[in-house]
């Protein structure tokens, strides 16, 4: 399985197509993760649509202060606090586990575009 992290910026999305072609040529499962997505930014929907048009599942992780606080403490977000940030990471892991055929312990991503 290949997880392709990218930010929802024009520069990152321009390179994304090459990464997706490599994953598809390898004939393996793939997941595009739009990372550090600003809240309520209209460009996110556009970035999601473009990423989805490339043929892989798309997930999004928001740009949230709890991630920075957890990093500064040397902790994972699940160790740091409960809330949208930890829910997004748990849902992301669930999607990865599902694609790998591992029984996930949490719900799948709600905001996935296939």
Predicted regions and their residues:
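Inter-motif core of Ras-like GTPase G domains
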Residues: 1-9
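Charged phosphate-binding loop/patch that engages nucleotide di/tri-phosphates or the phosphate backbone
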Residues: 86-114
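Loop/helix-junction capping segments adjacent to catalytic residues or to phosphate/diphosphate-binding pockets
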Residues: 10-13, 40-42, 86
């Amino acid at each position: 399985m290949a997880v392709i992290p990218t930010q929802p910026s024009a520069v990152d999305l321009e390179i994304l197509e090459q990464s997706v072609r490599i994953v598809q040529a390898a004939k393996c499962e793939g997941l595009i993760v739009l990372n550090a997505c600003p809240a309520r930014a209209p460009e996110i929907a556009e970035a999601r649509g473009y990423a989805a048009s490339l043929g892989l599942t798309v997930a999004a992780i928001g740009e949230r202060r709890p991630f920075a606080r957890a990093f500064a403490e040397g902790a994972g977000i699940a160790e740091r606090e409960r809330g949208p940030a930890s829910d997004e990471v748990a849902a992301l892991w669930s999607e990865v586990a599902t694609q790998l055929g591992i029984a996930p312990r949490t719900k799948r991503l709600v905001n996935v575009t296939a």
